[in-house]
Amino acid sequence: MVKVMIKRHIKDGKAKDVFALLKEQRVKAMNQRGHLNGETLMSYQNPHCLLVISSWQSMENWLYWKESEERRANEARVEQFLESPAEYDEYIFGTYPLYN
């Protein structure tokens, strides 16, 4: 299983736009092979900071969706409302030790 964490810093006054686009993107992700679930969290200390967490059956499933034209197009729409590029962290379960 894979957990993907995407951190975004939203420009002032653009939260409504970003939430609408992220909802649209989540609906599309739900129809992708290997997508398990997703959630969006807002920082308590900084409401302009969002963290999207999604779970996937495999890294291959996630990377296929991440690199798809459909997702790239929607992500480009989201980026216009961000202070900086989204930050991605990808984690895999049950692989210790990963390196020797």
Predicted feature residues:
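Generic alpha-helical hydrophobic packing signal
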Residues: 3-5, 18, 51, 77, ...
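Short, well-ordered beta-strand segments in beta-rich or mixed alpha/beta enzyme
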Residues: 2-9, 39-66
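An amphipathic, aromatic/His-enriched active-site/gating alpha helix that lines ligand/cofactor pockets
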Residues: 27-37, 55-89
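Residue-level signal for secondary-structure boundary sites
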Residues: 14-16, 60-62, 98
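Short, surface-exposed ligand-recognition loops at beta-strand->loop->(often short) alpha-helix junctions
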Residues: 9-19
